[in-house]
Amino acid sequence: MATSTLGRVAQALLAPALALGATVGLASAPASAAVWNSCDQWGNTSLNGYTLYNNIWGSGAGSQCVWANSGTNWGVWANHPNTGGIKSYPNAKKVVNKPITSLTSLTSNYNVTVPSSGAYNTSYDIWDTGYKYEVMLWVNKTGAVGPLGTSQGTVTLGGATWTVYKGNNGSNEVFSFIRSSNSGSGTVNILPILKWIKDTKGWFGNVTIGDVQFGYEITSSSGGLNFTTNNLTVSSS
């Protein structure tokens, strides 16, 4: 569930970083040497227009390391215990910073390799600039994980069919779209989803979209699991 999400965003911007699990850094590295890697709790860097975060924000977390060949090709090795509660959301962020009505397009392509075990979701996390509204798009999920809030039915938008949930985590409104079937690659047309929330449901107004994040919301990955973003692009105009 997307609880304490505002906290994880704020914490991901903090420095200095806290070292965590540095001895397992090599386990997270790709076959070829990455241009950047970090096992720090809040480790982050900027690469070709994207900002990468290790972002171990939940309580009871284990070890986690992130590596990157670029902002669009990166991965995570995580060893979090088999306990409840989200441990981390390692992600890549693209800044949009445009009101919805000023956008003519907002799309993303993704291609990931994810484990068959553990408990996690692969998701977009889209924020307004005031961090009052959070839109999550789950493209796949495994294990005992579920969205915050109550079901609002299903809708076909942006190239997929989703079950929609609406809730509040105490800090912000959360609108979660859970894809009807797991997908490891595809294209998401994000703008029609935002317009549906704004125009059809009226859940927010003409907010300014700040961040489009993409990553892995990990609850458990006992023994160490690899999550690889083979390719990610976020484009807006």
Where are these regions (language model features)?
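Long, compositionally biased interface segments
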Residues: 184-237
